[in-house]
């Protein structure tokens, strides 16, 4: 089965065409500057990238260009669009309504729209992409895969906030978690790689990218995760603050004469390691500044690693033990000095880091020593493949 995977943002769109049987990526690319001037990047497997500058007033024109590229006689991945069997859409927030991938009927889309206020930056864009695909491919099944779905197994003690219960009843204010597709994929891949029985395992997944989160996966199900109602809670991230004393919002608002939107902009876009360091949200830049002795870059890296280690420790307690810790995503897969810093706090678990294997980038590898009491590994994530494979079981 050929599955077109779509990840739609407000002015951009990423796509991959994947064969679910072979798990081969047939073609991939992105559309940028939708609504401005438009740019399509297309790459068939084994060929060079093709870049086309063309107007994309809306997502519909962008997706039409993707479809045209996919069955282009010269470099297309399919001879005819009828060879695309299904479209898998990433949807950021499914609230409490969706615990698994679902076919996108009108009834389902209405429920997704109800979740827009929980993810105002993401869900509306996801819906625009879905509608555009429906218009252009009316006979192809559309499936929604939700970032929040994997975390719906969290118990009430993990997802309820210490707020008046009426806010949960009226507005569904609770912890939802994100990166669920990645956490699900990596926990399964980790168990398979280490030959663990997923249904009898305790795995902690550290998805460390510009957005970052940790999850506790007990017997294949998520029992806790670091993000909350929104992706702002939890770890210190690229530009997001993560956990803070809520009273800071009032304090900063008064000092800086900001309204609530202004404060939220600071917490979401001007904080994290970029705000701490004054250098960058990119750990390649941070590592260079760290090695040059930049004190603020050193602070940023130390704070980031310390927060991750604290969450890992918390989830060891939540599961009463741990069999494996898996690092994934951009930083988790590629930044060895951050992994080393995080693991340095975990000696009490009997973890010993193998500094040689810890130098790996972007490949499956055990980075703990053979006599380490807990196995630590790097497991590359593949959210597009995970979305593709989730369609098979519907």
Which residues fall in each region the model found?
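Short beta-strand-loop/turn "lid" adjacent to the catalytic site in phosphate-handling enzymes
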Residues: 70, 74-122, 143, 149-158
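Conserved small/polar residues in nucleotide/adenosyl-binding loops
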Residues: 392-394
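Short glycine-rich, Thr/Ser-proximal phosphate-binding strand/loop in the N-terminal lobe
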Residues: 3, 12-56, 228
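Adenine-nucleotide phosphate-binding core of ATP-dependent small-molecule kinases
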Residues: 265, 272-276, 283-318
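Glycine-rich beta-strand-to-loop/alpha-helix junction loops that act as flexible
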Residues: 9, 89-92, 208, 326-334
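Glycine-rich phosphate-binding loops at beta-strand->alpha-helix junctions
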Residues: 323-346
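Glycine-rich phosphate-binding loop of actin/hexokinase-like ATP-binding domains
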Residues: 150-253
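Phosphate/pyrophosphate-binding loops at sites that engage ATP/ADP/AMP, CoA/4′-phosphopantetheine
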Residues: 69-84, 190-197, 312-323
